[in-house]
């Protein structure tokens, strides 16, 4: 398995993985538009050209938001998410980013534990943020 920068041939499998996770929160067109932005970066985990997962970042000069980090639901627990997050941390250090921020549903306990494992801490909450009424927890990791 390797982590590489997004290329356009990856968009269909990336969207397929995203669609299973987000209950329609992203449309194909929104994903395509985001990927065309200069400040959006996407890393893809692949095995023999099969997309296993991805991470989508939106950066500013000093920090970035992790918009999505998603692994194919049939392949979770195999270290793919860990490899993607390590790439995020490496990118942050290489580009001298001060911090990374993300949102996670308050009932997504596995994701919360995953983020905490990488040193993210909860800094806030957005009540009733998701369509289903769930709260979003805001997490942040400082690099500098």
Residue ranges and their predicted role:
Residues 50, 69-86, 93-95, 99, ...:
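Conserved glycine-rich acetyl-CoA-binding loop
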Residues 33, 107, 130:
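Positions that flank functional sites
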Residues 60, 101, 138-140:
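Beta-strand secondary-structure signal
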Residues 2-74, 85-87, 91, 95, ...:
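Acetyl-CoA-dependent GNAT
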Residues 103, 116, 121-137:
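Conserved catalytic-core motifs of GNAT/GCN5-like acyltransferases
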């Amino acid at each position: 398995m390797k982590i590489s920068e997004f290329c356009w041939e990856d968009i269909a499998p990336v969207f397929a993985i995203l669609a299973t996770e987000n209950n329609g929160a992203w449309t194909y067109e929104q994903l395509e538009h985001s990927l065309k932005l200069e400040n959006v970066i996407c890393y893809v985990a692949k095995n023999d050209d099969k997309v296993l997962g991805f991470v989508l970042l939106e950066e500013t000069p000093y920090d970035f938001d992790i918009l999505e980090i998603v692994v194919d639901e049939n392949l979770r627990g195999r270290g793919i998410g860990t490899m993607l997050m390590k790439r995020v941390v490496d990118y942050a250090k290489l580009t001298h980013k001060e911090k990374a921020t993300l949102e996670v549903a308050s009932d997504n306990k596995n994701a919360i534990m995953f983020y905490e494992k990488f040193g993210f801490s909860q800094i806030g909450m957005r009540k009733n943020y998701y369509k289903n009424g769930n709260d979003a927890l805001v997490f942040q990791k400082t690099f500098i």
